[in-house]
Amino acid sequence: NPLPESLTPEEQKYIIGTQANLWGEYVQTADYLEYMAYPRLMAMAEVQWTDAEKKDVNNFHKRLKTQFAWLDKKGVHACRNFYEAEFGGAWNNTQNVYEVKLKTLCPDAEIRYALDCADESRFKTYSAPIALDKETELWAAVYVDGKRMGGITHKRFAVNKATGCEYTCSPKAAWENMHEGYALTDG
């Protein structure tokens, strides 16, 4: 909402719209400018022109799929992160494994993945968290109607004896840049 609730109605009347910036120092080509601008400008238009009570991010994501087809038809070099698999996960204390969860913003899409293999022909359909008990590399991609829509996303998971363990430093570390008690684990 371009009119924050923290402002009074008197203050809100001075807001006449929204603004999207694209800093051009590192934009060397028109293709890269398009990549940086789309579909971000579509999201900006959604924020500006859709009434607050009608805003629905899931509906926007469904409509964005058709907008990509329109951008392709027009030859616009749009960013395809919408079609990338995202990695998440957490340690499962019950099974002593790290469970990787995959998701995508794209509705009605299928995620396919492979462990320790970038060969797309060996990808399996993702349906449940992936249990890892050792260091593993994972590749994943998003498919719509059997067609890969974005790039292949890759992540290395360093699962080892220390993963998921509670640990302390003894004696307590004294260096100033230590972040929340994290330090090198020996073993």
Question: Where are these predicted regions, by residue range?
Answer:
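Short, compositionally stereotyped local motifs that mark structural "simplifiers"
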Residues: 55-186
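Flexible, acidic glycine-rich loops studded with aromatic residues
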Residues: 1-99
